[in-house]
């Protein structure tokens, strides 16, 4: 994947990777262009991102004072601090419990819509891919093996139990099973 402006790419990893000696506000602003913004603009940016991610009361807190979901929100805010147009999300919700994961998925969709940004979201969860993606790519040996278009015709929030979603899920699982069977034969 090539980006015309790689500096506009924000990255959120599976683990938040926050610096424990920095407050949440300092962690969020770590990737911001400090030459481009005055101190007052940076403070305003931090407040905006804290509010956007629902962390406005925790700007002065340190990572060890936060839950896993809160730390992932902070990691998302940090990715947005660099004025990202696109997000690369590498299994950011994999380590979260079911309910926190659901909340983060909804927050992620809301933030992408509000900020009008695109994302490449890596996940091993078929359900998560169906809930969040418009296009689902299944990788095989470092290349795209299969491509499914969910499309924008399925509005958010999506219902995994709808006939249409169940049909798409069956196709994806069948593809994964066939691929798994092929690999076993070698």
Language model features: what each stretch is:
Residues 87-90:
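Catalytic Walker B motif of ABC-type/P-loop ATPase nucleotide-binding domains
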Residues 40-58, 110:
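Conserved ABC ATPase "signature" region
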Residues 25-33, 43, 47, 60, ...:
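Short helical segment in ABC ATPase nucleotide-binding domains corresponding to the A-loop/adjacent helical element
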Residues 12, 76:
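Hydrophobic anchor residue at the start of the ABC signature
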Residues 116-122:
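Conserved H-loop
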Residues 81-85:
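A short, proline-enriched helix->beta-strand linker immediately N-terminal to the Walker B motif
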Residues 62-66, 70:
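Conserved ABC ATPase signature
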């Amino acid at each position: 994947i090539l980006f015309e402006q790689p500096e506009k790419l924000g990255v959120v990893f599976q683990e938040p990777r926050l610096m424990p000696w920095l407050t949440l506000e300092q962690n969020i602003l770590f990737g911001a262009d400090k030459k481009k913004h005055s101190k007052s603009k940076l403070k305003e940016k931090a407040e905006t991102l804290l509010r956007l991610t629902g962390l406005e009361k925790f700007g002065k807190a340190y990572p060890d004072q936060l839950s896993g979901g809160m730390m992932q929100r902070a990691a998302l805010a940090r990715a947005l601090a660099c004025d990202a147009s696109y997000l690369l999300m590498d299994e950011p919700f994999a380590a979260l419990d079911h309910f926190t994961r659901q909340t983060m998925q909804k927050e992620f969709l809301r933030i992408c819509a509000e900020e009008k940004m695109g994302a490449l979201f890596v996940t091993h969860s078929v359900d998560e891919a169906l809930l969040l993606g418009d296009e689902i790519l299944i990788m095989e040996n470092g290349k795209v093996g299969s491509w499914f278009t969910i499309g924008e015709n399925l509005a958010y929030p999506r219902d995994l139990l709808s006939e249409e979603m169940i049909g798409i899920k069956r196709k994806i699982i069948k593809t994964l099973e066939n691929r798994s069977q092929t690999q076993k034969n070698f």
